[in-house]
């Protein structure tokens, strides 16, 4: 065989340039970059060194042959011509990977079979002995890539992908591959920082991938030093003595590296379930003396190295997959920015993000950005110098002011840490951190919120209202509904029309989310966001999350439970507050019937008002359970019935009389538990006729709905005494939206 070989090194997309630099430093010559790969020439020693020391490659492929290919027969004969007896025993095992298409081969499985057949036919002995297939741990892993009519046949020297270092047997929900983590560390300057004695901290460390890769770089440990089986282990071209020499050198370097004073490397993770898996991974990597992991929230992140050294803060914040994650992610980035400004002054920071726009919300400029791919997801690496001249907070500054700051950087006094009598550091007093500056649009939005608060303040205090709407798409470009629930904020984003640029809509949403906590003086962790779109069927009642957290609020002397996270609606329709208060005033001594009861908030008000009995009918067991808790919360139980069923069918079967009836139906509903489909416009007459048949003499029925195009059937006005009371059922907080609902008072004609 030749003394020099053509090598292909594959890597994640975006790492090609870094890998080329690394491979060249390890001895690869004539290096050229390709998409997700590099190629070059090397001797066997360099090929081994690349397998052992490359922190960035996925695979090291040794090219056996290139040949032109027009069809499947060319493929078969091109592979057959290789002297496979120089590479594999006749009773060995193989696995074949095929990539590319064309030249009559559009199915990679078919292409792999042709390659396998050629190898087997070449090595089959007269007595029938032949290689077999082992896709997991073969003696030889063969790769063929078809590229524009040329077949490139290679041996995979790495075996399993080189990112599998062997230490990470436990991982979190969205792990970074080890070689991507190493690339991020290298781009962030960690090799330089580590060589200078700097520290490293990860405030969202998960199971510790950044930490372990950083430790191996700092301790000069070859990333695959613990790998026992390689793609070349059973290859007949393998040179064991040369490999042992390189491996022994790597062991000696690791021993010397670990004998040094350990770098200060710390990780913090909010999820307690990930702490032990992270520690286990660190122990498997042999770095327990170098790396420590603690449970901790981003909000309390404060790295305190033992020698007061500065260093690198590195993290990979979650990307957010569920509807409603926008708010929590925005505030996570804001918290991270605050902690960097407060606790990491003069450090460097590297934030790897799948949402670069959120990176702008940290309140610190990035001086450099790099594009990466995490699988199929495009990402950015934001590099930050945590110095005051990079902070984007407080008042706006002119370009001239910024230039003066750059020319005359602020010197930050390093305060000597005080120790207690036991020699332990005394934690300093917390520092007040400036809020991240709002964008021009965000400030305009904040001003509107504060104006609305001021306008409604006197009314809210006079009425003793705990939950109300403070904003309802007042500004067309900020199409949100914002409700205050005591000291929580519930934000509903109305889906933007398709004509609106999604990036602009997203930017405006982020502007609004940044403004809300400041304008309303609310903890940013108490803001919940949802997207409200046109609902169909039972979709409006479908669970959006499963946190199961209930908040107790008060209204008109009753206590009610709301859930801001799990469903599109919260369990309390704020626009119907005046109707519930009316029912409470009129319910004394009466039999109250609540149809389409939802969480039975109207029934609670009726019971509070002294109703003789209440009956609440709804199709959903979930909401009736919620209703039961609402009633129990106020001490009501025995005389309050909760009935699960289709309202129309229930009315047809029921023969009781009621003095006060409230109907607030959905616009449209279907369910496996009901016969047919309910449409409020179509079915209004039948519904009201059935309900009026249950109304006692002198009784009152209140009918309301939120369908904006609803028209009350004229036959009802001829049949009953009907009064439109909509104007009396809309409070000040919904006065901007007079079409939020329609309401009628219906009685039997005298």
Swiss-Prot record:
NCBIfam families: PRK11783.1 (NF008748)
Keyword Magnesium included in the entry's annotation: no
Name of the protein described by the UniProt record: Ribosomal RNA large subunit methyltransferase K/L
E.C. number: 2.1.1.173, 2.1.1.264
Role played: Specifically methylates the guanine in position 2445 (m2G2445) and the guanine in position 2069 (m7G2069) of 23S rRNA.
Gene: rlmL
PANTHER family linked to this entry: RIBOSOMAL RNA LARGE SUBUNIT METHYLTRANSFERASE K/L, RIBOSOMAL RNA LARGE SUBUNIT METHYLTRANSFERASE K_L
PROSITE patterns, alphabetized: THUMP (PS51165)
Top-rank taxon: Bacteria
Annotated organism of origin: Pseudomonas syringae pv. syringae (strain B728a)
Enzyme class: transferase
GO molecular function term, any single one: RNA binding
Keywords: Cytoplasm, Methyltransferase, RNA-binding, rRNA processing, S-adenosyl-L-methionine, Transferase
């Amino acid at each position: 065989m030749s003394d020099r070989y053509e090598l292909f090194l594959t890597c994640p997309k975006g790492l090609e340039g870094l890998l080329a630099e690394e491979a060249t430093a390890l001895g690869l010559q004539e290096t050229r970059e390709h998409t997700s790969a590099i190629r070059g020439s090397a001797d066997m020693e360099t090929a081994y060194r690349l397998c052992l020391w490359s922190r960035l490659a996925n695979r090291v492929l040794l090219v056996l042959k290139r040949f032109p290919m027009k069809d499947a027969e060319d493929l078969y004969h091109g592979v057959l011509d290789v002297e496979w007896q120089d590479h594999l025993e006749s009773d060995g095992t193989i696995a074949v990977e095929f990539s590319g298409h064309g030249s009559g081969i559009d199915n990679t499985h078919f292409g792999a079979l042709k390659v396998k057949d050629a190898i087997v036919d070449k090595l089959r002995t007269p007595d029938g002995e032949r290689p077999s297939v082992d896709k997991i741990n073969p003696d030889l892993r063969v790769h063929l890539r078809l590229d524009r009519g040329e077949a490139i046949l290679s041996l995979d020297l790495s075996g399993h992908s080189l990112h599998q270092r062997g230490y990470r047997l436990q991982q979190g929900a969205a792990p970074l591959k080890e070689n991507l983590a190493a690339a991020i560390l290298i781009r962030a300057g960690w090799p330089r920082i580590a060589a200078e004695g700097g520290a490293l901290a990860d405030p969202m460390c998960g199971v510790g991938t950044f930490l372990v890769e950083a430790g191996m770089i700092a301790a000069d440990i070859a990333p695959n030093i613990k790998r026992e089986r390689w793609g070349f282990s059973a290859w007949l071209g393998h040179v064991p003595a040369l490999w042992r020499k390189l491996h022994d050198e790597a062991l000696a370097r690791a021993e010397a590296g670990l004998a040094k004073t350990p770098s200060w490397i710390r990780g913090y993770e909010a999820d307690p379930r990930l702490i032990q898996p992270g520690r286990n991974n660190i122990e498997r990597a042999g770095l327990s003396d170098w790396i420590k992991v603690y449970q901790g929230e981003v909000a309390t992140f404060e790295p305190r190295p033992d020698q007061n050294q500065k260093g690198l803060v590195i993290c990979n914040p979650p990307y957010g997959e569920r509807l409603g994650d926008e708010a929590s992610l925005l505030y996570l980035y804001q918290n991270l920015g605050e902690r960097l400004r407060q606790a990491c002054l003069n450090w460097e920071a590297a934030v790897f993000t799948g949402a670069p726009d959120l990176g702008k919300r940290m309140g610190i400029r990035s001086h450099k950005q790099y594009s990466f791919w995490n699988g199929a997801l495009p990402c950015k690496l934001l590099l930050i110098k945590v110095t005051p001249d990079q902070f984007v907070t407080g008042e706006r500054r002119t370009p001239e002011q910024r230039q003066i700051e750059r020319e005359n950087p602020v010197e930050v006094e390093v305060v000597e840490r005080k120790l207690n009598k036991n020699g332990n550091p005394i934690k300093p007093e917390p520092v007040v951190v400036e809020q991240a500056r709002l964008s021009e649009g965000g400030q305009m939005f904040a001003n509107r919120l504060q104006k609305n608060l001021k306008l409604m303040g006197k009314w809210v205090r006079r009425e003793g209202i705990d939950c109300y709407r403070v904003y309802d798409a007042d500004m067309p470009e900020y199409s949100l509904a914002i409700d205050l629930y005591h000291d929580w904020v519930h934000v509903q984003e109305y889906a933007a029309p398709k004509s609106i640029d999604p990036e602009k809509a997203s930017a405006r949403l982020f502007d609004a989310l940044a403004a809300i906590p400041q304008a309303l003086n609310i903890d940013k962790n108490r803001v919940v966001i949802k997207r409200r779109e046109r609902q169909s069927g039972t979709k409006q009642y479908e669970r959006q999350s499963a946190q199961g957290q209930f908040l107790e609020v008060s209204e008109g002397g009753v206590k009610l439970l709301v859930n801001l996270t799990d469903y599109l609606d919260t369990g309390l329709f704020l626009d119907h507050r005046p109707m519930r208060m009316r029912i409470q005033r009129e319910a004394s001594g009466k039999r109250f019937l609540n149809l389409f009861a939802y969480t039975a908030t109207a029934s609670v008000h009726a019971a509070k008002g002294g109703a003789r009995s209440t009956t609440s009918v709804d199709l959903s067991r979930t909401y009736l359970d919620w209703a039961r808790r609402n009633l129990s919360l106020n001490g009501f139980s025995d005389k309050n019935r909760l009935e699960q069923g289709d309202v129309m069918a229930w009315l047809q079967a029921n023969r009781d009389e009621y003095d006060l009836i409230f109907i607030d139906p959905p616009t449209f509903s279907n369910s496996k538990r009901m016969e047919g489909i309910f449409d409020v416009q179509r079915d209004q007459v039948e519904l009201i006729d059935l309900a009026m048949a249950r109304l006692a003499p002198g009784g009152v029925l209140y009918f309301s709905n939120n369908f904006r195009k609803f028209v009350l059937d004229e036959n009802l006005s001829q049949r009953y005494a009907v009064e439109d009371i909509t104007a009396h059922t809309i409070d000040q907080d919904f006065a901007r939206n007079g079409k939020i609902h329609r309401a009628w008072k219906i009685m039997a004609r005298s």
